Amino acid sequence: MLRNNLGNSSDSKNEDGSVFSQTEHNIVATYLIMAGMISIISNIIVLGIFIKYKELRTPTNAIIINLAVTDIGVSSIGYPMSAASDLYGSWKFGYAGCQVYAGLNIFFGMASIGLLTVVAVDRYLTICLPDVGRRMTTNTYIGLILGAWINGLFWALMPIIGWASYAPDPTGATCTINWRKNDRSFVSYTMTVIAINFIVPLTVMFYCYYHVTLSIKHHTTSDCTESLNRDWSDQIDVTKMSVIMICMFLVAWSPYSIVCLWASFGDPKKIPPPMAIIAPLFAKSSTFYNPCIYVVANKKFRRAMLAMFKCQTHQTMPVTSILPMDVSQNPLASGRI
């Protein structure tokens, strides 16, 4: 049935499968095209900065690099396919395309949530438990990063093999979890995803950043040398950047979670069409505001970006080894990531 529906003409889909007019589709398509271009360009610049300046290749930034990869993945696949379908007036890429599109968006989205959790754990171990942080090696960070990617892959594959399903949303121009079919399979999948990939990560992040904040307050009020204050200033920059990213993650994914919860415990037919399209758009929005957060909240990254635009081949960034926490700030080297 879904395959047949996806094969219908643009006109019939606009009448039967989409709750939006073509003008509304065009507005969404314009947004997607602009946001996609900004996201791809900005995240490529982010990767270029990390590649160019070895001073930025720290364990925490290795996680940020992977976040940039997830953003590029959504921008290069999710935005173009959805924009093309909006311009067409209905889903343009058939049943297989729907599965690939929705699966990749869930894959990159869940991976980014996992990576943000890893950043929070890294900040906690680096600042609050430096003795543990010192023992974290290349394999430790690789394992944490791979865990985030594997988690994303698992939840992306489940609807394809039968736990819930992917289908076009009410606009008919994008594919996602089929929340209009709120059967037992959908409800169990949705509740598990929200618990494991929303509630648990937020709990871990809150715990980590709460204790990080206490540690930073303690050290900033103590009588420290200038070099110690400089090291803590760097740590505060990285932590501030991480906290802003978490807050924006909450803003981005909350509408989508609300839609899924509404569909699970209420009547999916009563979900307002604007909310149905705003939810996935919000979820994708982190792809273009994350690079802005790196620039605004991190002085080292900001200096590196300016240096790259000035075509400087090397940027002087003093790396200190005074504090135990320097494990998470030293450039990547053999034996450490």
From Swiss-Prot:
<protein>
    <recommendedName>
        <fullName>Visual pigment-like receptor peropsin</fullName>
    </recommendedName>
</protein>
<feature type="glycosylation site" description="N-linked (GlcNAc...) asparagine">
    <location>
        <position position="8"/>
    </location>
</feature>
<feature type="topological domain" description="Cytoplasmic">
    <location>
        <begin position="298"/>
        <end position="337"/>
    </location>
</feature>
<dbReference type="InterPro" id="IPR000276">
    <property type="entry name" value="GPCR_Rhodpsn"/>
</dbReference>
<dbReference type="InterPro" id="IPR027430">
    <property type="entry name" value="Retinal_BS"/>
</dbReference>
<feature type="modified residue" description="N6-(retinylidene)lysine">
    <location>
        <position position="284"/>
    </location>
</feature>
<keyword id="KW-0157">Chromophore</keyword>
<feature type="topological domain" description="Cytoplasmic">
    <location>
        <begin position="50"/>
        <end position="61"/>
    </location>
</feature>
<feature type="topological domain" description="Cytoplasmic">
    <location>
        <begin position="213"/>
        <end position="240"/>
    </location>
</feature>
<feature type="transmembrane region" description="Helical; Name=3">
    <location>
        <begin position="102"/>
        <end position="121"/>
    </location>
</feature>
<keyword id="KW-0807">Transducer</keyword>
<comment type="similarity">
    <text>Belongs to the G-protein coupled receptor 1 family. Opsin subfamily.</text>
</comment>
<dbReference type="GO" id="GO:0004930">
    <property type="term" value="F:G protein-coupled receptor activity"/>
</dbReference>
<dbReference type="InterPro" id="IPR050125">
    <property type="entry name" value="GPCR_opsins"/>
</dbReference>
<keyword id="KW-0812">Transmembrane</keyword>
<keyword id="KW-0472">Membrane</keyword>
<feature type="transmembrane region" description="Helical; Name=5">
    <location>
        <begin position="189"/>
        <end position="212"/>
    </location>
</feature>
<keyword id="KW-0716">Sensory transduction</keyword>
<keyword id="KW-0600">Photoreceptor protein</keyword>
<dbReference type="GO" id="GO:0007602">
    <property type="term" value="P:phototransduction"/>
</dbReference>
<feature type="transmembrane region" description="Helical; Name=1">
    <location>
        <begin position="27"/>
        <end position="49"/>
    </location>
</feature>
<keyword id="KW-0681">Retinal protein</keyword>
<dbReference type="GO" id="GO:0005886">
    <property type="term" value="C:plasma membrane"/>
</dbReference>
<dbReference type="InterPro" id="IPR002962">
    <property type="entry name" value="Peropsin"/>
</dbReference>
<feature type="transmembrane region" description="Helical; Name=2">
    <location>
        <begin position="62"/>
        <end position="87"/>
    </location>
</feature>
<keyword id="KW-0325">Glycoprotein</keyword>
<feature type="topological domain" description="Extracellular">
    <location>
        <begin position="165"/>
        <end position="188"/>
    </location>
</feature>
<keyword id="KW-1015">Disulfide bond</keyword>
<feature type="transmembrane region" description="Helical; Name=6">
    <location>
        <begin position="241"/>
        <end position="264"/>
    </location>
</feature>
<dbReference type="GO" id="GO:0008020">
    <property type="term" value="F:G protein-coupled photoreceptor activity"/>
</dbReference>
<comment type="function">
    <text>May play a role in rpe physiology either by detecting light directly or by monitoring the concentration of retinoids or other photoreceptor-derived compounds.</text>
</comment>
<dbReference type="GO" id="GO:0007601">
    <property type="term" value="P:visual perception"/>
</dbReference>
<feature type="transmembrane region" description="Helical; Name=7">
    <location>
        <begin position="273"/>
        <end position="297"/>
    </location>
</feature>
<feature type="topological domain" description="Extracellular">
    <location>
        <begin position="1"/>
        <end position="26"/>
    </location>
</feature>
<keyword id="KW-0297">G-protein coupled receptor</keyword>
<dbReference type="GO" id="GO:0071482">
    <property type="term" value="P:cellular response to light stimulus"/>
</dbReference>
<keyword id="KW-0675">Receptor</keyword>
<feature type="transmembrane region" description="Helical; Name=4">
    <location>
        <begin position="141"/>
        <end position="164"/>
    </location>
</feature>
<dbReference type="InterPro" id="IPR017452">
    <property type="entry name" value="GPCR_Rhodpsn_7TM"/>
</dbReference>
<feature type="topological domain" description="Extracellular">
    <location>
        <begin position="265"/>
        <end position="272"/>
    </location>
</feature>
<feature type="disulfide bond">
    <location>
        <begin position="98"/>
        <end position="175"/>
    </location>
</feature>
<feature type="topological domain" description="Cytoplasmic">
    <location>
        <begin position="122"/>
        <end position="140"/>
    </location>
</feature>
